[in-house]
Design a protein with these regions (language model features):
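N-terminal low-structure segments adjacent to metalloprotease catalytic domains
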Residues: 1-36, 41-53
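Pan-zinc metallopeptidase signature
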Residues: 6-7, 15-21, 183-228
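Auxiliary, metal-adjacent structural segments of Zn-dependent hydrolase domains
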Residues: 11, 50-112, 119-123
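Soluble non-cytosolic domains of exported or imported proteins
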Residues: 42-53, 120-125, 129, 150-154, ...
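Solvent-exposed, polar/charged alpha-helical surfaces in well-ordered, non-transmembrane soluble domains
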Residues: 53, 57, 128, 132, ...
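Sec-exported extracytoplasmic/periplasmic mature domains
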Residues: 60-64, 135-144, 161-169, 194-202, ...
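Surface-exposed patches in mature extracellular/periplasmic domains of secreted proteins
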Residues: 60-74, 145-151, 173-176, 203-209
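Zinc-dependent metallopeptidase catalytic helix centered on the HExxH motif
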Residues: 96-172
């Protein structure tokens, strides 16, 4: 009996791992638009053009974008689906599978209204979220997998913020004051990265090649924005 239970468990585990590696087996509806492939288990959005055109324009302006790159966006229909396909990953608006670079969008992605929402109710433009997710994907494709898994999240968040244009709701004084307001950490990391790139006369790809120190970026940020 124990062997049967164990074998059953192995079958379930194997099926789960297969779905993580090939989510298209579950999210069986898809449509291609520009540089994107949208996948869903249920109904696909009727008019994704506005969001995807806006995101595509920003993505194509990245110094680590190469023609021919495509981005797979998977629309989850509920919190359980979002968690099931992104174990051990974090992200309120999106999560990127490091194995296959698939982007899982949080439930509630509204293409018609260009709105994305976290479980806590924090809103952002969906086009900005898609752009930010693409920044993570392009970084993943640019560096070695182990480098991606061990590099500082501040670099990923910072570049995603710069490429997406942010939300426009914060200023440097907010970043200096700190706090736990939704979106503030992304904005602050964007300032850190922006300051470092400008002072060193670098583009993001240069930084990926040579590496970056958060302590150094923090010093530059405080000197320029916080008075010391």
């Amino acid at each position: 009996m124990k062997k049967i239970v164990f074998l059953f468990f192995l079958v379930l585990l194997g099926g789960y791992v297969l779905l993580l590696a090939k989510p298209e087996l579950y999210f069986d509806k898809s449509v291609d638009y520009g540089i994107f492939t949208l996948r869903a288990r249920g109904e696909l959005p009727a008019s994704p053009e506005g969001v995807l055109n806006s995101a595509g324009d920003r993505i194509s302006g990245s110094d680590i974008y190469t023609p021919g790159q495509r981005f797979e966006l998977i629309l989850t229909s509920g919190p359980w689906e979002y968690r099931l396909f992104t174990p051990f990953l974090k992200g309120g608006f999106f999560r990127v599978n490091p194995y296959n670079a698939a982007v899982f969008l949080a439930p509630g992605a509204d293409f018609a209204g260009d709105k994305a929402v976290t479980a806590s109710g924090y809103l952002r433009s969906l086009s900005g979220v898609v752009t930010a997710a693409a920044a993570w994907v392009m970084t993943l494709r640019k560096v070695m997998p182990l480098t991606y898994l061990t590099m500082g999240d501040w670099e990923l968040r910072g570049y995603a913020e710069l490429l997406s244009g942010g939300t426009g709701e914060f200023n440097p004084a907010d970043a200096c004051a700190g706090g736990d307001r939704p979106g503030l950490e992304d904005y602050r990391d964007g300032l850190l990265l922006d300051r470092l790139l400008k002072e060193e006369n670098l583009v993001y790809n240069d930084l990926l090649l040579r590496g970056a120190s958060k302590e150094d970026a923090e010093r530059r940020f405080r000197r320029n924005y916080c008075g010391g």
